[in-house]
Amino acid sequence: MLTRKQHELLMFIHERIKEGGVSPSFDEMKEALDLRSKSGIHRLITALEERGFIRRLPHRARALEILKLPDAASPSLAMARGRGFSPSVIEGGAQPKPSSRDLAPARSSGDTMTLSVMGRIAAGTPIEALQEESHQVSVPLNLLGSGEHYALEVKGDSMIEAGILDGDTVLIQRCDTATSGDIVVALVDGYEATLKRLRKKGDSIALEAANPAYETRIFGPDRVKVQGKLVGLLRRY
């Protein structure tokens, strides 16, 4: 399955080749997908190539060949293209913070609440974000505070010293601000999502892992958007 950004890029390349006989430049692709850097385009093209949708023609500039297109009737793609952004989660691209209309409504029953699990969040190197509900989970109300919440499954081991393991389900309170030291869902450059501890360092923002194998990453404040903060965790044994 393609992510929304992968699908958008594939269709943009397809339309440009169909119209003009040549694939668009990286700058044109970056502008069309509203990304901040060409590195995001490189990652998307590599992902499309690995999935067999395109190939790069050697020794030629702006030379991409479309090998196949996704099934236009795919419901997941239709949903991704037809609605706004939901909370940022794995393997592909995203946009600004989710609005309440994008989340399935939480349902309360006695001392539990049913939350949408919006995919998997990278607790490792930031990876492109998906945005579709994968399933739902019942959560004890005493783990949640006020406001809106959603859940994400953890992918990676960068937060193990904070007690967050690969495969855990983290409970996120939706917000767009955080206090230095909070563990947050951070969207980097508009399309990469990660679960990290946020530190404010002067005019910069540091995203800290809780695993010495991972380096702290420093960004300008305009490059990082908070999409929620950690309020609880579920684990299966």
Curated annotation (Swiss-Prot):
Recorded superkingdom? Bacteria
Annotated region of DNA binding: 26-46
**What chemistry does it catalyse, as a reaction equation?**
Hydrolysis of Ala-|-Gly bond in repressor LexA
User: Which Pfam family, any one of them, does this sequence belong to?
Assistant: LexA_DNA_bind
MF annotations from Gene Ontology? DNA binding; serine-type endopeptidase activity
* Quaternary assembly: Homodimer.
Protein name per UniProt: LexA repressor
- Species this chain originates from: Parvibaculum lavamentivorans (strain DS-1 / DSM 13023 / NCIMB 13966)
